[in-house]
Amino acid sequence: MPTITLENVSKYYKNRRGNRSGRRYETGVEGVSLEIKQGEFVFITGSNGAGKSTLLDLISGRIKPDRGRVLLDGVSIAHPLPWQRERIALMFGRVVEEHTLIRKMTVEDNLMIAARVGRKRFETPQEMRDRIKKVLGLVGLSGMEGRYPVEMSLGECRCIELARAMINSPPVLVLDELTANLDDDSIWDIFHLLTEINRRGTTVIMSTHASQYVNIMRRRVVTIVDGQILGDVQKGRYGDVI
């Protein structure tokens, strides 16, 4: 059961024009230490630019830290050995803030690409189609295989992106602003869906600004301010700082 550990992690970005202090870099996160165990549901909260996306990118191995270590069961996510890379890649299902479905391809084709890129060993094309059918059922969109993203609502597209993240059965979902710009009903539907996914044992790590829903759900809440963790509260409320 994978445990994710961050040990004194920092990430900086070059700033060609400098900032008010004259420094040539900006802080993404600085001195972050965190442990997330399998089966947890963790909200990452904070204002725009606080470092939420950077933290999620570090956790999922999308970027490498400049200092510190990011570990999955003691194995470096940023610097794995060659034989560890595929295992680590299959551990994470990722949804980024930007919408990334290929608009001119069907839902089924979008999910097939993710399945192949993820390198999960589907024995036959039919096995892959059966998996696609299953994950679409999990997100409440059965029968949508032949639809195109342009024919669907924003909420439906976000659920398809979630299904795509789940196609290879990862034990960890890393979700960046999955509910951004959705109406209240769609937000609640997604949180209800994530609760069920988490109940089945999947770790959910999610950044969000949907404060009222975070307050209702009362899960673990990690609050980031200026790249540093200022709050980490079990059964917390949005923005809790301790």
Task: Label the model's feature ranges.
Residues S60:
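Helix-to-loop junction immediately C-terminal to a conserved catalytic motif
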Residues Y148-M152, E156:
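Conserved ABC ATPase signature
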Residues G68-S76:
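Conserved ABC transporter NBD signature motif
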Residues S76-G93, P125, R199, V241:
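ABC ATPase NBD coupling module
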Residues L173-D176:
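Catalytic Walker B motif of ABC-type/P-loop ATPase nucleotide-binding domains
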Residues P125-M144:
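Conserved ABC ATPase "signature" region
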Residues T45-S47:
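The feature captures the beta-strand-to-loop junction immediately N-terminal to the Walker
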